[in-house]
Amino acid sequence: MSHSNAPELHPQIVDPFHNVTYRPGKLLGKGGFAYVYEFHDVNSDSSYACKITPRSALQKKKYYDKFVTEVTIHRGLVHPNICRVLNVFKDQMNYYIILEKCNGGTLTDLIRRRKHLTETEARFFSKRILNALWYLHDLYIIHRDIKTSNIFLMEDFDVKVGDFGLAVKCETPEELHWTMCGTPNFLPSEVIYSHIMKRKASGRGPDPNLDEDCVNLCHQLLPAYSGQGHSFSADMWSFGCLVFSMIYGRPPFEAADIKTTYKRIVRCDFSFPGSISVSEDLKNFIKGLLTPDPRKRFTVKECLDHSWLNPSKYFIPESLPPRIISEPYEVPPLCSASPTRNMQMTINMAKNAGGTDGRFIAATPQAIGGTEHIPTPGTANFYKPQNAILTTKSAAGISRASTAMAMQNVGSAQGVVNKYGINEAEYPQIDPPCYIMSWVDYSNRYGFAYQISNGSIGVIFNDESAAILSPNALIVDYSPSLLDAAFDRALFEEGTTILSEKKFKLLSFFRDYLENRSIVPIPAADRPKEDEELKRVIEQERMNNQEIDFKRLTKGLPLPQLFLKKWKLYDDGTLCLLFNTKVFQVNFADHSKVVVAHRSVTFMSEKREIYTYPSEYLKDDRFSFKELRRRVDRARKYYEIIKAARPVDSLAQYRYNKDSTKKSASGSSTRQLGQGGE
């Protein structure tokens, strides 16, 4: 294990926090300051990839901050097409990031062995990479280093996007960044131009590889907007370079030296080699991605809607066989003969499997309010980021019924047209967001308490303060004023310094009350073993008279946790709820509910049926679910009212309405989701 500048490794590496011992194996790769080794758990013999960064390499603050940013972003991502961070720890010599191991190598390895891939194979990989990018961009994360060597493959060739060393999380969708970073062959033109303009504004010259000719070309050829920073569209340019590389075996702007490469990027100087015959749809797809103006460049949604990825026009396999390592994938004859016939075959297969509308579904839902029968939309195949330590198992999944539908729908939506005439492959799969399952209104005395579907309990007290109890009831976040929303964190135990004794007892009471009245209470047996480990670490630090750093011990849990920011209860029983994430929920008087999230709308009927649709459906004239449209329109009107209100306007009605004789009112979701929601 002797490698130049490689980190010093002992025969056994111990993670004291999780009490796991690893045995280092072979070197898998390296880049920058980090080295990636194969690690074996000596107890279970499970294999992982471990990214190791020597502490000596992070002595400068900017390098350490960059490392912290990478870990913070990456460990919060949970998606089937993103390489998962399983653990992070350190010893006296190194920092260790334990990752799921991708035994299929990288996309670069596959291209080198094959020289180039077929369009069918490229479609398979592109769909999965786009799913990952949709997820990242939905979280306001720019990867900034999309390239073939950062696309890791499992043994079955499933895709895992990795290496978030250059990633950045934006506060708003409009936020722009100026840092020139990435891999030269995959660098978008606006990254180059923005770097030049920022250096010019500070009186400094550009990067040595950007010569005077390149600077002049930027001013002559690129729109002024491109010099103002880069955003999510930078990932789409890099993705275009990646697609080109899959088909032709090399990046589109590759040259003998970096200076020439940069000038070719600025000129958008690339061509499609005639030696490989490709479809016009592919050429149009790549051109739409390699567009110099980032405002006109294809978005993830436009890519997924493009004819090159249309499963009714082109066959897109659900999996690839092992032999593609050495030979092209052959499209099955029945699939290549006729796209129309291919789609009809898929629909017939779905119907034969029990679906009434050409989908694999568990059962046909009952009519809602006597309106119409509604087929279930494609249920999610991936999960939202959750903290790894502080979430109960029962707070980690959607309903059994919804899960069953999800498992049946995985991989079956390609080319399937639902009741509304909408090809479900046109829209990304989603799952229900977290929502408030049950609540109790004691604002005539104490405040408003609620239980979220992730298992946490929250209270908005009458003095405008707020507390959120983590799903495992170990950690509490508290803010003395919702107007400021500045939260402190502590252990949830008697004598805690951030909560008064009265509020501690009230939060304990509301927790017991809400969990006991839930349809499916969270069983104590489902608390994860990490809870006990967290307790053990805290007790050990107390014995050693160490100051307990809750931010360190609970860094997988956002501060603050998801909490209710505003609420309003109307006389007719309609309850409006606004989260700090801007997710908005309306509980209607007939016990149906609507949850409006950033990219989805969830409808819960009074009969406990749950449907989650992409928000884009509401813009599609073919989507004829009139009842949902009507309720979403009502929800939007409520939203405009509540967003302008103070956090505790609802409480004020009890303070100043002396004629009110209302006692406490309470409500519970008519649900079949149990305590879950990932």
Curated annotation (Swiss-Prot):
This is Serine/threonine-protein kinase PLK. One of its GO terms (molecular function) is protein serine/threonine kinase activity. It catalyses: L-seryl-[protein] + ATP = O-phospho-L-seryl-[protein] + ADP + H(+); L-threonyl-[protein] + ATP = O-phospho-L-threonyl-[protein] + ADP + H(+). The keyword Cytoplasm applies. The modification Phosphothreonine is found at T179, T183. Residues 658-678 are annotated as: Disordered. Involved in cell cycle. Involved in cell division. Involved in cytokinesis. Involved in flagella biogenesis and in regulation of flagella length in interphase. Involved in formation of median bodies during interphase. Phosphorylates Kin-13 in vitro. Likely regulates microtubule (MT) depolymerizing activity of Kin-13. Changing T179A: Substantial decrease in autophosphorylation, reduced growth, increased number of cells with four or more nuclei, increased number of cells with condensed nuclei, and increased length of the caudal, anterior and ventral flagella. It comes from the Eukaryota. Residues 663-678 have a biased composition (Polar residues). SMART domains: S_TKc (SM00220). The active site is at D145. Autophosphorylated. Autophosphorylation is critical for its function in cell growth, cytokinesis and formation of flagella. Inhibited by GW843286X (GW), an ATP-competitive inhibitor. Inhibition leads to reduced growth, increased number of cells with more than four nuclei, increased number of cells with condensed nuclei, cell cycle arrest at G2/M or G1/S phase depending on the treatment time with GW, and increased length of membrane-bound portions of the caudal and anterior flagella.
